Amino acid sequence: MLFRSRVIPAVNQVRLAPGVYQEEVVDYCREKGILLEAWGPFGQGELFEQKEVQEIAAKHGKSVAQIALAWSLAESFLPLPKSVTVSRIQSNLDCFGIELSNDEREVLKTISVTSGAPRVDEMDF
């Protein structure tokens, strides 16, 4: 990112969600002080079917979406959820104050999903 520029970006918007953790990008941005904006914090929808995520949500009395957003915040990401439904937008705000344990955060980070983030260095433009 910085090999052609001397200006460090303030924000890097990348696909980050439970099960879609781009460790190299996360580490690099944290090292450079770049805020990570988590585009697609709910993944491709399969996150809502994951038993482990449902169990964490039930334990906290929250929805899977709220848990995904709480995980993003716990990882110091800025999640960017998309919705046009007022009730879902309001529900998303209930993610604040959810305290996930380190074990729960690790489960969410490493959960197996099939629809990961595309790697730019592997794309054929």
Give each language-model segment a name.
Residues 1-125:
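Beta/alpha (TIM)-barrel catalytic core signal, keyed to glycine-rich beta->alpha loops juxtaposed to Asp/Glu
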